[in-house]
């Protein structure tokens, strides 16, 4: 039997707060391995622009590259449409052995959000929670809400005792855009990836675009992702962003420019007999 923990997140970017949580969970003695789930299209973030899924997956992968007990999953990224936690858990359960245990790891804010999720009763009946207190919430407040969930759902909730590292993804992105020192914010491998691809270089202008454009591009990315290796995929995303930047500057169709940039190499990694 393997004791798995599931830690999900947008990871935009993966930062030292995520890394600290992972290390605390592994050091708790309660977990053998961690599944790091990179978020797909989240139901509560449809009006928020996030970086392309493949960028976020690669940042997470590099952020834990030295931790053998951690595996990064793209299960949600590969799924079309919105990703609900219950659907992810159902799919993940099919990949685990019947005698494996799965614990869900969250920040304490989830204790207040969970009742509004899809099928919270099913989630809490099947899976125990391991909670890290953070976000300015006191342990007393978190424990009071945990007691309410125990009473309403018979939830199994345990708290991590070690202090967390409080970091804001927005703060980290702004630091990277300004090319300021980031050693205390993100792992070195992640910083190198961000710098090499200038991942947040056009954020000021691209964030202002209609989120519907990003949803369309995200769907194209999901479809093209299986056909490209990592190097070619990241290159295509870089071209997509630069094409959109130029389209905005010259008042051209931003969506068309983005699609053209993303798909310009879509057959580059295919065998000749497949293309023909």
Regions found by a protein language model. Name each.
Residues 202-276:
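Acidic/His-rich, divalent-metal-binding segments that scaffold phosphate/diphosphate chemistry
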Residues 1-215:
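Nucleotidyltransferase catalytic core that binds NTPs
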């Amino acid at each position: 039997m393997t004791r798995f923990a599931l830690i999900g997140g947008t990871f935009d970017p993966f930062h030292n707060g995520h890394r600290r949580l992972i290390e605390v969970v592994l050091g708790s003695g309660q977990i053998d391995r961690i599944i790091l789930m990179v978020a797909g299209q989240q139901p509560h973030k449809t009006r928020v622009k996030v970086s392309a899924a493949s960028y976020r997956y690669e940042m997470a992968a590099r952020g834990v590259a030295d931790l053998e007990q951690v595996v990064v999953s793209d299960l949600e990224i590969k799924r079309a449409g919105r990703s609900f936690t219950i659907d992810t858990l159902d799919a993940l359960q099919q990949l685990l052995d019947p005698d494996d245990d799965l614990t869900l790891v969250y920040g304490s804010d989830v204790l207040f959000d969970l009742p509004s999720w899809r099928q919270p009763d099913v989630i809490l009946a099947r899976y125990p929670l391991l909670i890290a207190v953070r976000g300015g919430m006191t342990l007393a407040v978190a424990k009071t809400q945990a007691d309410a969930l125990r009473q309403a759902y018979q939830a199994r909730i345990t708290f991590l005792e070690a202090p967390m590292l409080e970091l804001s993804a927005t703060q980290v992105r702004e630091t990277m855009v300004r090319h300021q020192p980031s050693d205390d914010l993100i792992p070195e491998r992640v910083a190198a990836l961000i710098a090499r691809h200038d991942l947040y270089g056009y954020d000021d202008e691209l964030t202002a675009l209609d989120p519907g454009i990003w949803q369309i591009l995200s769907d194209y990315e999901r479809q093209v992702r299986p056909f490209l290796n990592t190097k070619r995929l990241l290159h295509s995303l870089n071209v997509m962003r630069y094409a959109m930047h130029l389209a905005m500057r010259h008042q051209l169709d931003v969506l068309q420019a983005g699609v053209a940039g993303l798909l310009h190499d879509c057959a580059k990694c295919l065998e000749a007999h497949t293309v023909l």
